[in-house]
Amino acid sequence: MRRVAVIIPARFGAQRFPGKPLADLAGQPLIAHVVDRARRARGVDAVAVATDDARIAAAAEAAGAAAILTGPASTGTDRVAEAARKLMPSPDVVVNLQGDEPLIEPEAIETLVRAMEGGVEMATLARPLEPEELERTQVVKVVTDRHGDALYFSRAPIPHRRAGGVSALARAHVGIYAFTAAFLQEFAALPPGRLEAEESLEQLRALEHGHRIRVADTAYRGFGIDTPEDLDRARALLAAGPRE
């Protein structure tokens, strides 16, 4: 049986929201909500938080996750790769779950893990694209081939529909990833790509170097906390009832 670990990168010094992982959300640190959702996903054997901050590490352990202290890293994926090397027992599949997704649905994680079957080395999620999202650069779009592997990710409207409107093939990317343990280390060691730099999308590095990314469908829309205002929205959603 393959061993699946969810590793959550978290840092204290986010520019737009310093201390975000420890911000209070319904009486708990934000990072505790992410840990709890990850632990509820079936098929997950271990949940760990990768951080360079002792305060975040303590909050992670209090929430039931392993805390792995890492050095300063240029990206969250670099931090996850370092943590995966330190995690024992070693995982076969690593899920990179952002530490600012307190409403992540356990079913979305389960869908992602299932997508890693059949020799897939990297996978991610996508959902239907809403018409009002077509021109929004903060909503990343993805198009796939007939096998469900990504052809391209872009902040631009793709695919272009000559007749106008939103193509039925258009999907919005949900930024959670799974890797085989071996490919995670390979990916982290790859030099950044030109398209990655142009779009500011790290996943394009894999495509530029000739690797495939399996894209699985999900109903989860994604809800990242980037600002204090986002946190207020999350508080309102939790007060209205937990998303199951």
From Swiss-Prot:
One of its GO terms (biological process) is lipopolysaccharide biosynthetic process. The keyword Iron does not apply. Keywords: Cytoplasm, Lipopolysaccharide biosynthesis, Nucleotidyltransferase, Transferase. Pathway: Nucleotide-sugar biosynthesis; CMP-3-deoxy-D-manno-octulosonate biosynthesis; CMP-3-deoxy-D-manno-octulosonate from 3-deoxy-D-manno-octulosonate and CTP: step 1/1; Bacterial outer membrane biogenesis; lipopolysaccharide biosynthesis. Pfam families: CTP_transf_3. Its EC number is 2.7.7.38. Its main location: cytoplasm. CDD domains: CMP-KDO-Synthetase (cd02517). One of its GO terms (cellular component) is cytosol. Activates KDO (a required 8-carbon sugar) for incorporation into bacterial lipopolysaccharide in Gram-negative bacteria. NCBIfam families: kdsB, PRK05450.1-3, PRK05450.1-5, PRK13368.1. This is 3-deoxy-manno-octulosonate cytidylyltransferase. It comes from Anaeromyxobacter sp. (strain Fw109-5). The gene is kdsB.
